[in-house]
Amino acid sequence: MSATVVFDLDDTLVKEIDYLKSAFKAIAVKVDSTNDSLFNQMLFWYQNKENVFQNIESHYGFSVNELKQQYRTHVPDFIQYKGVSELLLRFKEKGCFIGLITDGYSLTQRNKLKALGIEELFDLIVISEEFGSEKPNENNYKVFHQLATKDYYYIGDNTAKDFLAPNRLGWISVCLLNNGENIHPQDFTKETVYLPQKTITDLNELFTFI
């Protein structure tokens, strides 16, 4: 195979805000299934940078730790992301290896992959809690060199940590530009080594150069 195509997960293959909304819906049902407005109230608190879980604890008595646990362990509703598996399969059909590098809790990230129906499509998955280090640690990327392909691509979104290691390792780094919904801001004024070599507005644009 001539290329290894490695993706970030949050705000690349799936929007983190959609995971948050899915979790909030599940928590709202658990906390007060009779209150149809609780979900919107939680979003209002979040958007106003209030501590959502502390507010729920104060109003309903559920502990912050219990709420965090449900947030991290729930299986999200990602029905709107049917196109992700089709995208990955296109790369497989082109003869590419595909991989994932993501930071976070193992159960949380694996539940996202299962909800997307893509866990089994990857040739290699690196999740920080399982692997023992987070981006931008080069080891999280170097492990893909065992696939021994000519070219390596990393597609992510976070200019603070996604592109530093692949740039240093000679990979081709690609940034999916923020459509206004990302959790983390993108800073293109950083040193060049932190910045992607290419930018795209849609993942399907990858097929124009891979």
Give each language-model segment a name.
Residues 12, 19, 106-107, 181:
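Conserved Rossmann-like nucleotide-cofactor binding loop
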Residues 1-2, 89, 108-210:
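Asp-based, Mg2+/Mn2+-dependent phosphohydrolase catalytic module
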Residues 13, 98, 154-155:
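Conserved SAM-binding loop
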Residues 6-8, 101, 155-156:
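Generic enzyme active-site microenvironment
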Residues 33, 62, 96, 150, ...:
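Short glycine/serine/threonine/alanine-rich loop segments
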Residues 2-82, 86:
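N-terminal helical cap/lid subdomain that shapes the substrate entry/recognition surface
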Residues 66-77, 84-116:
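Substrate-recognition element of Asp-dependent hydrolases with the DxDx(T/V) motif
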Residues 10-13, 95, 117, 170:
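Conserved functional loop/turn residues at catalytic and ligand-binding sites
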